[in-house]
Structure formats: C-alpha cells, structure tokens
Design a protein with these regions (language model features):
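Sec-dependent bacterial lipoprotein signal peptides
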Residues: 1-22
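N-terminal leader/targeting segments and the immediate start of mature chains
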Residues: 23-126, 252-320
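Tryptophan-centered short beta-strand motifs
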Residues: 70-75, 163-169, 173-175, 202, ...
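Short amphipathic beta-strand and strand-loop transition segments with alternating hydrophobic
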Residues: 84-86, 186-196
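Short, solvent-exposed coil/turn segments at beta-strand boundaries
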Residues: 90-97, 118-127, 146-154, 198-202, ...
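An acidic-aromatic
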Residues: 111-180, 225, 236-239
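Gly/Pro-enriched, hydrophobic low-complexity segments
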Residues: 129-143, 195-266, 270-277, 282
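Short, surface-exposed linear segments at secondary-structure transitions and domain or protein termini
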Residues: 153-154, 173-183, 225-226, 248-257, ...
Length: 320
C-alpha cells in the first residue's frame, strides 16, 4: 500500500473510532453534577474487571427472573421511562460536557480493551476524545473537533501538544446531543428491572436494538450511571460503560470546542499524499526505508523534524 494510502487509512480509522464512540449510545453516569442545571447523583464505583460482578436479567422475551437473576417488567408507556425523560430534559442543551469510561469484554470474560472518553458541545461545535488501552498495554489517544463551516462540519484530528490539526473529512450532519450519547435512538419497547453492580443495586431499563440488548442503570434522581450491552446471538456481555461526569449549561464545555490558540491547521489530500496549511503551503510525504516517511516542502527541503507529531501519530495508529 502506498504511503499516502496508509496515511489516509490512519486518518479515517481515527475519525471512524470517534464516530463509533459517539454513535453507539453507550454510557452512563450522571455523577458530579451540581447546581445551575447540571445533572447530579451519587458517584458510582469503577467498572468491574470481572463481568460476573454485574448481575443482569436473563436474555429472553419473558420477564420472570430465574434463581438469582432479576425480573423484568414491561414499561407500558416508554415516554415515561427514565431514559425518555432524560432525553427530553436535555434535548435542547447546546453546551455540555461528558466524561465516560467503557470496558469491552472478550469471549472469555476478560477485559479486551478500555476506553476513557470525553465529549463536549458548545453551540454548533463539538469535541470528542478517546484514550484506548488494549491487552498489549499500548495506548492510543485521539482528539477530534467538529467545527461548523457554513452548511457542513469539518472534522479535525487534534495534536494538542504540537499545536497542529489535520482536517480529516467533512460531514453534512453531526448529532452530538446528551440524549444521543446515552441512546442513539429512543426505543419503542422497554422493560424495567433492578440489577446489581458489585454490591450496589440500581433501577435499570432494558431495550433491544438490532442484535444487541442495552441495560441502562439510573441514579435516584434519574440520571444514567451505567450501561451494559449484551450480544443476543452470543448471549454474553460485550461492553460496560460508566458515565463519570455529565454537566450541562453555560461554561461546562471547558473551552474544548475550539482550536487551541496558535494551532496550525492542515488539509490532507489522499490522492497525492500531501498536506496543505492554511496559507496554501504544500508539504509532500515520501516513503523512507529508515524512518517510514519524510516530509518535504515545496522547495524540496526536508522538513520531517517539523512534523514529528505526524510520525508519532502513524506509529500509534499502526500499533508500533
């Protein structure tokens, strides 16, 4: 694969990873709220490393519990569910901040991957970051900004410490709302139940979406705290999400929804393997057997050292 195709693949992978985080509807904690319209609630325990510490209802169409499994009760009017009420309460929120942790489990029940994610919105602009740690203990940190540009949103991959950003793609629509972070589509059939996470019991609501079952736990004041996803075909828990912080209202986005001062922006041409900065200067990527690639300016000067952040990014995305 040509270098610029590899670069394009890395950029796309990073952009898609962020899209998956925001579109999956996973997550949960209404903790750390306070006054001024911010959701509040108790601070939950960290996600268990052992999924056996999470006691969920049986996977079936019925509602009766079996043995130590909790019972599911149909919610007659899903519009009165805590999930729907949360979505309704914050449907118009144009500034917020969410901090979450997700754990993905392997078929043997062990932790296959953990993700620490943050999402923020202010007006039409959005920010999402995710730090991923796999079984190889190698961490990937991806930050992205979706900035409104006339009728579309430009998505930038942000390299904060190097004060650089690459435009990865443009989108016609961005749905980053508090409700969408919990459930990307409001279900039409739901059940209520009570489940245990470690020693603590929580009121929870269950619904199915395609071949997956979602169980969302709530604090006493109606804020999401955990969400668990099970594969209905494999009949096993595949992920658990904890919302560590949910805040809504003026000032809660923490200044994340804009490019940091002094950031240099670049667009990437995946047909030519070149970067173009805001002033129109073009930088070309060329393969190098020793370092992987080199970067040259329009005069043919080697400026690779000025783009070390890009080298580090490619190494991170390729697992090196």
């Amino acid at each position: 694969m040509k270098l610029y195709k590899k670069a394009a693949a890395c950029l796309l992978t990073a952009a898609m990873a962020i899209s998956m985080l925001t579109a999956c509807g996973g997550g949960g904690n209404g903790g750390n709220g306070g006054n001024g319209g911010k959701p509040g609630g108790n601070t939950p325990s960290p996600l268990p490393n052992n999924p056996d510490q999470i006691v969920l209802p049986d996977i079936d169409e019925g509602g009766e519990g079996t043995g130590t499994k909790p019972t599911k009760t149909p919610i007659i009017d899903v519009n009165n569910s805590k999930l729907a009420q949360f979505d309704k309460k914050y449907a118009g929120a144009t500034e917020f901040y969410v901090e979450m942790q997700e754990v993905d489990y392997g078929k043997d029940g062990s932790v296959a991957r953990s993700i620490d994610g943050r999402a923020a919105r202010k007006g039409e602009n959005c920010y999402v970051s995710m730090a991923t740690l796999g079984k190889n203990n190698k961490q990937q940190l991806i930050e992205t900004l979706m900035l409104k540009n006339k009728s579309t949103w430009d998505q930038y991959l942000l390299f904060r410490s190097s004060k650089a950003a690459i435009k990865a793609r443009s989108q016609d629509d961005v749905d980053l709302s508090l409700g969408a972070l919990i459930a990307n589509k409001q279900p039409t059939q739901m059940w209520s139940t009570e489940i245990k996470v470690g020693p603590t019991k929580y009121y929870a609501e269950v619904y199915k979406y395609y071949s997956y079952e979602y169980t969302t736990c709530f604090t006493a004041d109606g804020n999401p705290v955990y969400q668990f996803v099970r594969d209905l075909n494999e009949k096993q828990l595949i992920s658990a999400t904890l919302y560590k912080t949910i805040q809504a209202g003026s000032g809660t986005s923490k200044g994340l929804c804009a490019l940091p001062t002094g950031t240099k922006t670049y667009s990437f041409d995946d047909n030519t393997g070149s970067l173009t900065d805001a002033k129109g200067n073009v930088f070309t990527l060329k393969e190098n057997g020793t370092t992987g690639f080199k970067v040259y300016d329009q005069a043919g000067n080697d400026v690779t050292n000025d783009f070390k952040w890009l080298t580090d990014f490619f190494k991170m995305m390729s697992g090196q």
